[in-house]
Amino acid sequence: NTNVLVTVEPGVVRNANVGIVSNAQINESVDEMNLLAQTATGDTDVVATQILLQTDPGAYASSVVAVSGPANPYALPTTLMLGMSEAGDVAMERLMQLRPQMTAPQAPPRQRGSGGPRSTAVAQSVASQRRKAFGAELNGPTPDEGMRGWARGFGFAGSSSNQNWAQTSYDSTLGNVAAGVDTVVGDGGILGGFVGYMPGSVNVTGGLVDESMTVNGVDFGMYGSWVPNRGEWYLSGAVTGAYTMIDRTRNIYVPGVVRTATSSSNAWSASFMGETGFNLPTGGDSYVSPYVRVAYTDFNQGSYTESGAGSLNLAVGSQSASALQPSVGARYMDGIRSGRSVITPFVGAAFTAFLPVGDWGVTATNPFSGLPPISVYGDVETLYGGSVEAGVELALPDGLTLFASFNGMFMSDMQVYGGRAGIQIPF
């Protein structure tokens, strides 16, 4: 049992816990470490000798784990994949726009066109027809009246107690500020694009090693939606990509060998997602909308080499990871008239899952990575749980729209809390 306390240096005590390790694995590793200490020179000899001074089997095993690989190579892909699906969802989310319009009287459409103002009678006729269509008034003017620009953002903080990777846990934050524009395509269709800035961080803690990552990225994509004229159901989707720069610090806390390794890497990510649902009236201007959403996300990180930690520096190979994120849920929203403005509170909940696809493994090498492995690692974890949302949208006269919401996700070994906000402006 590696769940023991280790005095790293005066005043610094760490829990060496990396799980349960067999005595046979430890004995085989010690034999090879002795051989390395006898044949190696320089810093490799110094580190091997210090590790062999760990008389507690648990402390020895945790020391080998700390010096021979990254702290948790699953934490960064998981965080960025959740962020990519969030960015796509925020971009394509249209709330009441994808529902039938409210039945209360509305102002005539804004006057446009080079041929002069439209007559009141024509405007009222057009408005009457559009009351039967989907509720674009709550996200700007009806699409065939013009284009709409928007600025939206999200931010979330997550924590994970991952038991599959050497007993590590990690905290993460990720934000996004994006701007986009969309317009009508065909009958009842919307097509748009966006670009945004995505900062964040991932901090891994476990055993005798910590790893912190600072993330800065640019994301971009296209999205669209389609609603039949009566608004009984809808279809929406998004395709997003991101280029991310990662600055990394790995702190090793082996007694006698306290080191810090730094590195930088780049990653590309892509996400494909779609959602479809029904609009079920519950009286007045209230609707329940059951929906199904599926997202597929792919992550590819380039290789990198650490510096600053002597023989403990790792040369880490490229990494590829993919995941499916299905959700089944429902939203309830109620449109409330306030003069010519519309206030729409909404709530929602869904069952959701994070299903890793393929092998997420990564190869890391240094003088100690070739030792017999101490098997404390597991595969990337499949997550199941639920998500919730609660917010309000305010549609002002002439199409200006604002919204804000709280969003949370509660999954096995992971909790994520955050929010969304945005503004949409017709032009």
Protein language model regions, located:
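Extended hydrophobic secondary-structure segments that form protein cores and membrane-embedded regions
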Residues: G149-W150, G237-V239, P290-V294, P345-A349
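Solvent-exposed flexible segments
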Residues: T240, T276, L280, V288, ...
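Extracellular/surface-exposed low-complexity segments
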Residues: N1-G83, E93
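Outer membrane beta-barrel transmembrane domains
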Residues: L312-F427
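Short, structured loop/turn "capping" segments at alpha-beta junctions
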Residues: G283-S289, F299-S303, S338-T344
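Outer membrane beta-barrel translocator domains of Type V secretion systems
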Residues: L52-G284, F403-F427
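Gram-negative and organellar
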Residues: A133-F134, N139, G153-S161, I252-T262, ...
